[in-house]
């Protein structure tokens, strides 16, 4: 039985969405159990033989400063959910709450793995090859050093290797061009570190990639800082939404376009399902001594269910131990990079 701790109060919609998703998830996973963390009155209407309520009196708001979430709201649903992972009561925690708060609380309670300075958010985005590209970081770390990007590359490679049972997934460094001479000094230095890691056998480093390569599936892992990654993510979601709305408008234009829509319906449905960002919701916070998954704050029930699915798959595939093993193998390289650059910012 795989147990997940769910922050039922987090996100833009709270229990209205999270509880609906939890029911759908339990109905499709007979070997899963959920710890529903939140204010008991808000969760009172939910009953399932494989779900139990863990009370938490406080809620971390989407605009709460990190200091408030970490130091003042010590009985928040987010913190209590992560505490379940620390105490061994749950294999993973899932939250749609405040990203900064989730990262800070997770890092405070669970700590980072040896050789890792900062955890990274690592979602999987659909690509043209019918698979997914893992991109990290997508919002947790806005300002990154070259050494942080090396750590992200090792963690992302370990994640894809664990989920896909693949020995050496390809890794690309997001840049403004493929040439080694392009990019900021941080990116150039990161390229040097990644090439060294590739030569040492710790990575299958492809080289520099551009934004369109994420969706081409040029590499299985793309490494970038959180600012660039988050912009790329939100831009892709905006484009997908724009195309979907434009198609709906065009097919409603007249009787002939409506007839065409009927004929094309199966193809359009398959296409929309393939690019629907809700079905790719749920990103691992890599680099921690426990499994934590971040859902979009605006997630609906379908999207949050997929975040639960990702956490379940990670726990079932023993993701944490497999990532830890890969990072341990690369630890001398990571420590050497850290020592060359001096102490990293927290």
Swiss-Prot record:
It is found in: Cytoplasm. It catalyses: a fatty acyl-[ACP] + phosphate = an acyl phosphate + holo-[ACP]. Keywords: Cytoplasm, Lipid biosynthesis, Lipid metabolism, Phospholipid biosynthesis, Phospholipid metabolism, Transferase. It is an enzyme of class 2 (transferase). Gene3D superfamilies: Isopropylmalate Dehydrogenase. InterPro entries: FA_synthesis (IPR003664), Phospholipid_synth_PlsX-like (IPR012281). Its main location: cytoplasm. One of its GO terms (cellular component) is cytoplasm. The keyword Transferase applies. Pfam families: FA_synthesis (PF02504). Pathway: Lipid metabolism; phospholipid metabolism. One of its GO terms (molecular function) is phosphate:acyl-[acyl carrier protein] acyltransferase activity. GO terms for biological process: fatty acid biosynthetic process; phospholipid biosynthetic process. Its EC number is 2.3.1.274. Homodimer. Probably interacts with PlsY. Belongs to the PlsX family. Catalyzes the reversible formation of acyl-phosphate (acyl-PO(4)) from acyl-[acyl-carrier-protein] (acyl-ACP). This enzyme utilizes acyl-ACP as fatty acyl donor, but not acyl-CoA. This is Phosphate acyltransferase. It comes from Delftia acidovorans (strain DSM 14801 / SPH-1). The lineage of its organism: Bacteria, Pseudomonadati, Pseudomonadota, Betaproteobacteria, Burkholderiales.
